[in-house]
């Protein structure tokens, strides 16, 4: 099976070593029987390893970072739907020069791959599948405030699909981007949760709670496994979501960024 790992990098928050280490982790944890390829969408390819297939961000108004990154179109200091360039990855089978087919796995740069990714590749071959924030308290999700704010219950740190299964997302963005940026202001996780999730077109399936954990949130609310800033050996992925705004920061949540990590067990993987 052809396996296409995809990521995206823009601006200066993440250096090239984040991309290179992600590639190394993905390759180490992908079975040798697969045909492995690694792609990176970026506005600056300096420092990337030579075996990474670079895709310059297509020059599409209001989606390419140059049209909004650092402009005045911000909310609380962040661009409306600040990670919008990540929507391009769902059209990688057309944007990449080699027109890849097979399984596509998108990873955020602030992910650590701890174990074999085979379960991610084979969990559901019939539907696109992504992480869900199982560590999140489900009670606020039932409130009117959560629905009016289009709150997010999915986590885009890992998203998997086959061939053109997710191309419909890219077409939706092209056709409705102004509405999307101003409706789902806090990011693409909000967009996916409502437009394509349980309250939308039900495109996405979700990986089980034991596939990933958040270093700053825990693993599962239902399993009462919410201790933060600890290494969990068995999950496939560790993600590093943090609160971006002071009013979001809640007691009991960690705030460790990946480049501040000192945990020796996790650092063994992140290289």
Q: What are these model-predicted stretches?
A:
Residues 1-70, 97-100, 163, 241-246, ...:
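N-terminal anchoring/stem segment of glycosyltransferases
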Residues 34, 50, 86, 107, ...:
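Residues that flank catalytic or metal-binding motifs in active/ligand-binding sites
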Residues 35-43, 103-107, 111, 128-132, ...:
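Short, hydrophobic beta-strand segments that form beta-sheet elements in well-ordered domains
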Residues 54, 84-138:
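GT-A fold catalytic core of metal-dependent nucleotide-sugar glycosyltransferases
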Residues 61-65, 78-85:
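A short, glycine-/small-residue-rich helix N-cap motif at loop->alpha-helix starts
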Residues 73-78, 142-149, 223-226:
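Short, P/G- and charge-enriched loop/turn segments at secondary-structure junctions
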Residues 117-189:
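Conserved catalytic core of nucleotide-sugar-dependent glycosyltransferases
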Residues 156-271:
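Catalytic core and acceptor-binding pocket of nucleotide-sugar-dependent glycosyltransferases
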